[in-house]
A protein has these predicted regions:
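Alpha/beta-hydrolase active-site loop
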Residues: 52-78
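Conserved alpha/beta-hydrolase
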Residues: 31-49
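Short beta-strand element of the alpha/beta-hydrolase
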Residues: 7-16
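The serine-hydrolase catalytic nucleophile loop
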Residues: 17-28
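Hydrolase active-site cap/lid region
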Residues: 98-147
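Short beta-strand-to-loop junctions in surface cap/lid or active-site-entrance loops
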Residues: 1-7
Length: 200
């Protein structure tokens, strides 16, 4: 709209499972300070075509991140292709940490109570993960067993600690809830955070 002389930063915010669709309060706060904000709906969520899987969420985030760097997008929305941030809430934090490994050009990451989808399986509590899956009943083409198997197949790949090399020198903002019982800091994010603290 010509209100900013310099190209604007672009922020991509990914939603949780099935989560809050757009995190509108945060979106508007970012918009008011001059950011262009995208809140994509992953495959199978809120009317989007396709099936909702953790691996699809990562693929979707990669596709959106590459799209916002195209000349067409940058010209239309007056954004800086070198000032793109990726963030997410809960399972969207999982999406962010796994997608960022293939997006070394990101300016920064925003994690809000990130949920490590493989953690409960790795910690010997797969039934606790399965107990969460009925919440996805409203997702298109959703099958609890297929969803679980998609996560299970990514143990050792999607573990948060595997993101260390991608985030060790990255701008990172992580917001956690001290009383969060679904994605507790100690279990979900603290193992990676300790690795980052030890990084010189």
């Amino acid at each position: 709209d010509g209100g900013y002389a310099e190209p604007r930063p672009c922020v991509i915010l990914t939603h949780g499972y099935p989560g809050t669709a757009r995190n509108d309060d945060l979106v508007h706060a970012l918009r008011r300070v001059g950011c262009v904000v995208l809140t994509p709906h992953h495959r199978g969520a809120w009317g989007s075509q396709g099936n909702y899987l953790v691996s699809h969420c990562v693929e979707d985030a990669l596709a959106v991140a590459e799209y916002v760097r195209t000349p067409e997008f940058c010209e239309k929305f007056h954004t800086d292709p070198d000032c793109v941030f990726l963030g997410g809430h809960s399972m969207g934090g999982n999406t962010t940490l796994n997608a960022c490994r293939k997006l070394p050009w990101l300016r920064g990451l925003i994690l809000m109570t990130p949920f490590d989808s493989t953690r409960l399986i790795r910690n010997g509590r797969p039934d606790q993960l399965r107990a969460l899956l009925p919440a996805g009943y409203n997702l298109t083409g959703y099958d609890e067993e297929v969803f679980f198997r998609d996560i299970e197949a990514r143990v050792g790949e999607y573990d948060f600690e595997k993101s260390f090399d991608a985030v060790k020198d990255q701008n990172l903002c992580c917001v956690e809830g001290a009383l969060d019982t679904l994605a507790p800091l100690e279990e979900m994010f603290l193992p990676l955070w300790r690795m980052l603290e030890a990084h010189p």
